[in-house]
UniProtKB/Swiss-Prot annotation:
Its main location: membrane. The gene is PTPRA. Residues 175-802 are cytoplasmic. GO terms for cellular component: extracellular exosome; focal adhesion; membrane; plasma membrane; receptor complex. Pfam families: Y_phosphatase (PF00102). It comes from Homo sapiens. It is an enzyme of class 3 (hydrolase). Glycans are attached at residues 21, 36, 68, 80, 86, 104, 124. This is Receptor-type tyrosine-protein phosphatase alpha. The modification Phosphoserine is found at residues 211, 213. It catalyses: O-phospho-L-tyrosyl-[protein] + H2O = L-tyrosyl-[protein] + phosphate.
Length: 802
């Protein structure tokens, strides 16, 4: 029996005894006295009216109920008092005795108190005997005195009872709190995230422990406190975030993994320490004659307000691909979310469980590829699956969509949550309402998988309750699958994604709504002097430039290679060129890789070469096989050099091992096209490079219309299709303002053509995270919107969107 239950019984007993003693009055009283003497002899009790209590050592009040009733162990207690006659000091003594009440109301001690304990006296005698005495009923004066004492004793007993009750309550609270912290007990009800309780049979499964909404160290956060709290917890190298993550329970319940641990199933597990719990694992339909064929390393996971919204699974192994597709079919899944690459750091993370093209049969499931769309952060594959077997009773086909997030780095987490939020939005929009659980997997099915699940749930909670409970939700889903959200970096990334969504929201637009949006953002915002467009750009300029992540560009040897000291590439995406033999610090050029719509590193955003960096510029072009150069500045503007001429006006010119020859020059309406033959004399190889020199950008401001920009973007994309999708080198003077505007427009227009959707704000925001000051002015930002609107108006295919 639990200790707290024993305390309840004990306390109840004490209260009952105390209550009985305090509320009964008898006509006759038996008094027991301790006598300080070497021999115990009877002594007459003398009536002391002046101080009746001084002569009483123990007072027992007889109950009024029927005579000849035996009370069961009762405690007689003697209290210290001084005898005014003989100066003896009486010491407290407690004895367990049985007492019989005689018909005349006198006390008849059983066995003459033979079990009474003796204790040393505090008086002068060397030895002391404790001798209980029985006194006959005294006269009326004694009875009156004792009646006067009864209310005092009743008050004392009542106070003692109250103290006992308070003590028991405190002990029970402490025991209960301790049990909650240990979180090891079973529960007979399942606490859903929306507050409903679903009853289950006792002892059937270990269920989720409830997380109290109050009295918790990491309670839910209101969204308006999110930014402040994240900044506080990220201080001192994420110290508080690490503490919060480490406080998460590894498993809030006592769960078993018996099925996963069977010898027949061990080979089906990718990692020996990542096993599904028995109570939440996905059960496959057993295959006749195949033992333990109901097992797969996958677990049901709750969403915010939806039970078993997800199935968290490990990345299939070669020997479990058939089981994976069997699970997809049996669970009526329509959406698969993959958050790993097939190989990372040369290690297999997941078997390819789909054909590249055509169809393939996995067990009794035929999978055919219907469509593949490759984007910068993820790939979307559409499969048609069908159960095969009895050809006379063919099952209907089903459409399965796989969303494969490809931007998760081998180490850590994505440097920005923008891509993950776009990915998640696409998953939410495409999963049919009728479908079964969404299958989410990475390699182990816990780290990145858990991160995706938590972001999804917390975005739902944010919209519904205007608060988030990351700690509580991670704790709950860890009771369904171990180690969900595996690292503190993933835990911080969840908060960053939530903050990103809270601060900037969903800024995607259908092309049909662009005109209305433009009218709206030109209106003044109440309470401010800015319109909506100015507020958008203000948010962009508030993005912190990470000067501490520009180490190489700030080295003394490289400072002279920078045209503008405020625009230096970040370390994580700077373009690296081969080091010259015997020369240090020769791998630097002021240029950054920039992601496009469909692929990473689509562009190289570079400053206009200085005279002493032309060789480095061409070494970069050669090393990264760039076949298209976009120049957005004149060599000189307003009497200042903006870019050194890095190509010959005619003939050829050498820059170190690189020679450049002008083969052809053609003037177009707003730009010049130059075909250059570039040769690496050391490698004895040549390449054709095409330069697009845009003349439509005035020295001050922006182009008068977007026609020229639309034209040059189309020409560059055509060149890319012919020469291969190597990076497009884009430069102006500093490689930020006009360069960023070109990259933004090229990316936005490509998405408009593919999806009919645009997001100018997030596109520019992403550029600024990759290189400082991309799209440098409000005019340039506004120009992006105007060019997109012109593009939609100019092309009939997109004019139909209206």
């Amino acid at each position: 029996m639990d200790s707290w239950f024993i305390l309840v019984l004990l306390g109840s007993g004490l209260i009952c005894v105390s209550a009985n003693n305090a509320t009964t009055v008898a006509p006759s009283v038996g008094i027991t006295r301790l006598i300080n003497s070497s021999t115990a002899e009877p002594v007459k009790e003398e009536a002391k009216t002046s101080n009746p209590t001084s002569s009483l050592t123990s007072l027992s009040v007889a109950p009024t109920f029927s005579p000849n009733i035996t009370l069961g162990p009762t405690y007689l207690t003697t209290v210290n008092s001084s005898d005014s006659d003989n100066g003896t000091t009486r010491t407290a003594s407690t004895n367990s005795i049985g007492i019989t009440i005689s018909p005349n109301g006198t006390w008849l001690p059983d066995n003459q108190f033979t079990d009474a304990r003796t204790e040393p006296w505090e008086g002068n005698s060397s030895t002391a005997a404790t001798t209980p005495e029985t006194f006959p009923p005294s006269g009326n004066s004694d009875s009156k005195d004792r009646r006067d004492e009864t209310p005092i004793i009743a008050v004392m007993v009542a106070l003692s009872s109250l103290l006992v009750i308070v003590f028991i309550i405190i002990v029970l609270y402490m025991l209960r709190f301790k049990k909650y912290k240990q979180a090891g007990s079973h529960s007979n009800s399942f606490r859903l995230s929306n507050g409903r309780t679903e009853d289950v049979e006792p002892q059937s499964v270990p269920l989720l422990a409830r997380s109290p909404s109050t009295n918790r160290k990491y309670p839910p956060l209101p969204v308006d406190k999110l930014e402040e709290e994240i900044n506080r917890r990220m201080a001192d190298d994420n110290k508080l975030f690490r503490e919060e993550f480490n406080a998460l329970p590894a498993c809030p319940i006592q769960a078993t993994c018996e099925a996963a641990s069977k010898e027949e199933n061990k080979e089906k597990n990718r990692y020996v320490n990542i096993l599904p719990y028995d109570h939440s694992r996905v059960h496959l339909t057993p295959v006749e004659g195949v033992p333990d064929s109901d097992y797969i390393n996958a677990s049901f996971i709750n969403g915010y307000q939806e039970k078993n919204k997800f199935i968290a699974a490990q990345g299939p192994k070669e020997e479990t691909v058939n089981d994976f597709w069997r699970m997809i079919w049996e669970q009526n899944t329509a959406t698969i979310v993959m958050v790993t690459n097939l190989k990372e750091r040369k290690e297999c993370k997941c078997a390819q469980y789909w054909p590249d093209q055509g169809c393939w049969t996995y067990g009794n499931i035929r999978v055919s590829v219907e469509d593949v769309t490759v984007l910068v952060d993820y790939t979307v594959r559409k499969f048609c699956i069908q159960q095969v077997g009895d050809m006379t009773n063919r099952k209907p086909q089903r459409l399965i969509t796989q969303f494969h997030f490809t931007s998760w780095p081998d180490f850590g987490v994505p440097f920005t949550p923008i891509g993950m939020l776009k990915f998640l939005k696409k998953v939410k929009a495409c999963n049919p309402q009728y479908a079964g659980a969404i299958v989410v997997h990475c390699s182990a099915g816990v780290g990145r998988t858990g991160t995706f699940v938590v972001i999804d749930a917390m975005l739902d909670m944010m919209h519904t309750e205007r608060k988030v409970d990351v700690y509580g939700f991670v704790s709950r889903i860890r009771a369904q699958r171990c180690q969900m959200v595996q690292t503190d970096m993933q835990y911080v990334f969840i908060y960053q994604a939530l903050l990103e969504h809270y601060l900037y929201g969903d800024t995607e637009l259908e092309v049909t709504s662009l005109e209305t949006h433009l009218q709206k953002i030109y209106n003044k915002i109440p309470g401010t002097s800015n319109n909506g467009l100015e507020e958008e750009f203000k948010k962009l300029t508030s993005i912190k430039i990470q000067n501490d992540k520009m180490r190489t560009g700030n080295l003394p040897a490289n400072m002279k290679k920078n045209r503008v000291l405020q625009i230096i590439p970040y370390e994580f995406n700077r373009v690296i060129i081969p080091v010259k033999r015997g020369e240090e610090n020769t791998d630097y050029v002021n240029a950054s890789f920039i992601d496009g719509y469909r692929q990473k590193d689509s562009y190289i955003a570079s400053q206009g070469p200085l005279l002493h960096t032309i060789e480095d510029f061409w070494r970069m072009i050669w090393e990264w096989k760039s076949c298209s150069i976009v120049m957005l500045t004149e060599l000189e503007e307003r009497g200042q050099e903006k870019c050194a001429q890095y190509w010959p006006s005619d003939g050829l010119v050498s820059y170190g091992d690189i020679t450049v020859e002008l083969k052809k020059e053609e003037e177009c309406e707003s730009y010049t096209v130059r075909d250059l033959l570039v040769t690496n004399t050391r490698e004895n190889k040549s390449r054709q490079i095409r330069q697009f020199h845009f003349h439509g950008w005035p020295e001050v401001g922006i182009p008068s219309d977007g026609k020229g920009m639309i034209s040059i973007i189309a020409a560059v994309q055509k060149q890319q299709q012919q020469s291969g999708n190597h990076p497009i080198t884009v430069h102006c003077s500093a490689g930020a303002g006009r360069t960023g505007t070109f990259c933004a427009l090229s990316t936005v227009l490509e998405r408009v053509k593919a999806e009919g959707i645009l997001d100018v704000f997030q596109t520019v925001k992403s550029l600024r995270l990759q290189r400082p000051h991309m799209v440098q002015t409000l005019e340039q930002y506004e120009f992006c919107y105007k060019v997109v609107q012109e593009y939609i108006d100019a092309f009939s295919d997109y004019a139909n969107f209206k």
